[in-house]
């Protein structure tokens, strides 16, 4: 577990895990690491892991809970086509409205904008 020591200008440089205490002690899994006012075991990161059986049980619960959402009614193909047709007609109306707006301005304004 290397640490970072920061001088006054905050550039910082690292020390390896062998020199943390400046005593030459090497840390093992059984050696606690000093963290401010308390000691934390260096193997603490391996605590709280779930077993495979526990994971399988929770996965089954999750599937049971969320499986109902996947069974939705199928949409008929003609409904999809009707919606697509409406969308196309709406975009065509919008496009034609945009064209008619630009034609109202007249040819001279249209060309002066391009220059």
UniProtKB/Swiss-Prot annotation:
Post-translational modification: Cleaved near the N-terminus by the viral protease during virion maturation to form the mature protein.
UniProt GO cellular component terms: host cell; host cell nucleolus; viral capsid
Comment field (misc): All late proteins expressed from the major late promoter are produced by alternative splicing and alternative polyadenylation of the same gene giving rise to non-overlapping ORFs. A leader sequence is present in the N-terminus of all these mRNAs and is recognized by the viral shutoff protein to provide expression although conventional translation via ribosome scanning from the cap has been shut off in the host cell.
Gene Ontology terms, MF aspect: DNA binding
Purpose of the protein: Plays a role in the inhibition of host immune response within the nucleus. Interacts with cellular nucleosomes and immobilizes the host immune danger signal HMGB1 on chromatin. In turn, prevents HMGB1 release out of the cell and thus decreases inflammation. Also plays a role in the wrapping and condensation of the viral DNA. May also promote viral genome import into the nucleus.
Coiled coil: none
GO biological processes: symbiont entry into host cell; viral penetration into host nucleus
InterPro entries in the record: Adeno_VII
Family stated for the protein in its record: Belongs to the adenoviridae histone-like nucleoprotein family.
Propeptide: 2-23
Lineage summary: Viruses, Varidnaviria, Bamfordvirae, Preplasmiviricota, Tectiliviricetes
Region (Disordered): 85-115
Gene: L2
Pfam families cross-referenced by the UniProt entry: Adeno_VII (PF03228)
This protein's UniProt keywords: DNA-binding, Host nucleus, Host-virus interaction, Late protein, Phosphoprotein, Viral penetration into host nucleus, Virion, Virus entry into host cell
Triggers of expression: Expressed in the late phase of the viral replicative cycle.
Subunit structure: Interacts with the core-capsid bridging protein; this interaction bridges the virus core to the capsid. Interacts with host NPM1; this interaction might play a role in placing the pre-histone-like nucleoprotein on the viral DNA or regulating viral gene expression. Interacts with host HMGB1; this interaction inhibits host immune response.
Protein name: Pre-histone-like nucleoprotein
Native organism: Snake adenovirus serotype 1
Keyword DNA-binding attached: yes
Residue window of motif Nuclear localization signal: 114-115
Biased composition (Basic residues): 85-99
């Amino acid at each position: 577990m290397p640490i970072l020591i920061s001088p006054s200008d905050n550039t910082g440089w690292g020390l390896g895990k062998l020199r943390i205490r400046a005593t030459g002690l090497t840390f093992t899994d059984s050696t606690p690491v000093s963290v401010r006012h308390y000691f934390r075991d260096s193997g603490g990161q391996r605590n709280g892991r779930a077993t495979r059986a526990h994971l399988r049980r929770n996965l089954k619960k999750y599937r049971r809970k969320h499986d109902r959402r996947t069974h939705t009614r199928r949409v008929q193909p003609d409904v999809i086509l009707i919606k697509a047709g409406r969308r196309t007609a709406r975009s065509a109306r919008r496009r034609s409205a945009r064209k008619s707006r630009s034609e109202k301005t007249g040819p001279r304004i249209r060309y002066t904008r391009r220059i």
